[in-house]
């Protein structure tokens, strides 16, 4: 069955008037009957299952149809509250623990995920310690649909302020969760699952920096332990390579997923430990740099795109450029990489040129300013700040030979240099001065033109 069937209509069964749940047409009696049948089905098969191996079993088609209706209906708040009152979380927990059927586990976790969208049921679910333990253990389940629903349940609970701390504490107490999430990111090709796991990690790291750092630091400890103790011991999966693997897969499959994982990488670079994890990887961050550079130069803000593309890509741009900028100033191999930063000069200049066009349009539309417009202005300013900082660092490191090559390849032009001056001055005057000195050795005419422009901008 590829999708959940629609809920039964009110004509499916005659029921007393007071049998309805809240203001819905759903029958309490029908819920009682369905859940009771489900309990009997699981309990009835338990004794025989104990005598056999842990072989997965199929779910009865008719019963699957009925509990899928419960799954659909649990998105209704009245139904979710009724299920809470009926002790459904405890019932579903018991079924999940006993279940030998992947589809049944998926549906039960899905019902809990729907219920957790509402405050009171979410509180009940979150305060159930046994349920919390089982939910985290399910992240090691081999069934992708079950993993998807489990990730959705955890993300929904983490998004509820009243219980987010409870769940964060559970994550801290279960280091195996990190390993399971890394395994999913590194090995799964399921786009929906990777997106949900990314959203879960993004939420978790954003709300709990200490947890993020502890998971990253564990990579350093385990890497040293494997190196020192056993040549034949398989190295544990590290967080950064796993994040990169998922990001690469989602690049062409899910813009939303790509945005999510880039934001996680951005969160890492806001800390020294996170930055070290990226730039001190075995390859010195080469694979990460190559991927992010290629993404910037070939996917984002392309020459034929309209200027407003920066508004659509503002989140992607702010994250990817922030990570690249941090890597650039943090890596020992920076000077060896200068030649490969030349295409980034073109990309950064294009971003700044498009931002200038957007700012002109925003100025013209000031009379119609709204909260959404002001929010756009804020995020566009973030993109500008990150772009300027990164560009200033690149320009300040260029040598005469780098500039000559940049000119010959078309990455350094008068138009792009003028755009850089308009945006970098006066804040990055030292970087501009350093660039102009090197430029003077490579192209005196262009350097003189820019020097005059610098004087005008300084006035």
UniProtKB/Swiss-Prot annotation:
Superkingdom as given in the UniProt entry: Eukaryota
Lineage of source species: Eukaryota, Metazoa, Chordata, Craniata, Vertebrata
Q: Where is the composition biased (Acidic residues)?
A: 10-21
Q: Where is the signal peptide?
A: none
Chain residue ranges for the region called Disordered: 1-21
| Biological-process GO terms, alphabetical | positive regulation of synoviocyte proliferation
Q: Which family does it belong to?
A: Belongs to the SAAL1 family.
Name of this chain's protein: Protein saal1
Localization in the cell: Nucleus
Function statement: Plays a role in promoting cell proliferation in response to pro-inflammatory stimuli.
* Alphabetized PANTHER family for the sequence: PROTEIN SAAL1 (PTHR23424:SF23), SERUM AMYLOID A (PTHR23424)
Q: Which GO terms describe its cellular component?
A: nucleoplasm
Q: Which UniProt keywords apply?
A: Nucleus
